[in-house]
Amino acid sequence: LTTQPVGVISDKMASASLRGARGNSGVILSQFIRGMAKQLKPLEEADIKQVADAIKSGADVAYAAVMKPTEGTILTVMRALSDKALELCGQELEMPAFLEQVIAYGNEVLAKTIDMLPKLKQANVVDAGGKGLMTLFEGALYFLQNNEVIEVQTKEKKAEEPEAPAAQ
């Protein structure tokens, strides 16, 4: 793997996430990444305090981008990640241990989203956007621990052409 400054990587992620955003959670996630990238842009590397500040910036930008923020969604999970990261940034932790604790707390809050919105409770599911956010953080931790990228093959689904009505 090639090594690039964290600021360059985060800037590329912000651009790609906005271009690839799908649905409300995708757009909100792109704003979270944009907020993180803004904080990380000038850096070659990032320490725990800088990552915590970036997560907070991401959550703040995401909340500001939504006209009527709703708790029990991806926003709630973002705020939880931010709160935990800021709480831990004064401790002497290595980055993987820091992320493990941030992720554990994020997953605790994610599990509670089922009770925060009636539609989630009725379907007995957690917020999908929040789950996606946690998967992103878990992937970052996996990479830090294993220095390995998991290749995922995706197919872009194209809209089918409507059939022409039969001539009569």
List where the protein language model places each region.
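N-terminal loops that bind phosphate or other acidic moieties
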Residues: 1-168
